[in-house]
Amino acid sequence: MPILRNDWNDVIGGEFQKTYYLELREFLKREYKEQTVYPHMNDLFNAFHYTPFEQVKVVILGQDPYHGPNQAHGLSFSVKPEVAVPPSLKNMYKELQDDLGVTPVDHGYLQPWADQGVLLLNTVLSVRKRQPGSHKGKGWELFTNEVIHALNKREEPVAFVLWGRHAQAKKEAIDATRHLIIESAHPSPFSANRGFFGSRPFSKINHWLQEQGKAPVDWQLPMKAELYSYGK
């Protein structure tokens, strides 16, 4: 059975046979056996499962998963519904409200965005508990670089959202003459006041999507009570 269960398998499924990925897989087997690692192994590729390749309209690039209990579930910036909204996501909600009048919600579960074609992609897809950056340089970056290359080559253009220096390092892999690139400071409390607040990324994305003849993203998330009927 393929690891990726939709059209992503045709696009990047070959990566799973490459030497770097086989080494990464052995590393992950050891880590999941000997350490507490997030997200759960079954959630590693959720970004791809929720947002098929041909449906990607927007990419919001993160770094590595949240490293606290019950937070990470395979989507960048998103957390499971039952845990507190992380500070960076709170700042994203604040900017959404200022930008588009979107009401902040009482959870951080972003799957409704993913279902609309927003690929919530971290450049590293796993992390040890309480050790940010602990799976950096193990092979994930090569894998997610291929994801970005595949989207860059695709005929249908994509809006790439690059917040902070880590994400902006990927800019050279993106053809800015074909795709939209949105850059600013990261929404982290350490940097949000240095150019994230007031950057209006969400309205820029929707304006561009409409110019492309595509439906805008409905950024308004359901409240937590409604999530259970949403089908989390």
UniProtKB/Swiss-Prot annotation:
It is found in: Cytoplasm. It holds the Pfam family UDG. GO terms for molecular function: uracil DNA N-glycosylase activity. Its EC number is 3.2.2.27. Belongs to the uracil-DNA glycosylase (UDG) superfamily. UNG family. Its main location: cytoplasm. It is an enzyme of class 3 (hydrolase). This is Uracil-DNA glycosylase. The lineage of its organism: Bacteria, Bacillati, Bacillota, Bacilli, Bacillales. The active site is at 64 (proton acceptor). It catalyses: Hydrolyzes single-stranded DNA or mismatched double-stranded DNA and polynucleotides, releasing free uracil. NCBIfam families: PRK05254.1-1, PRK05254.1-2, PRK05254.1-4, PRK05254.1-5, ung. GO terms for cellular component: cytoplasm. Keywords: Cytoplasm, DNA damage, DNA repair, Hydrolase. One of its GO terms (biological process) is base-excision repair, AP site formation via deaminated base removal. The keyword Repressor does not apply.
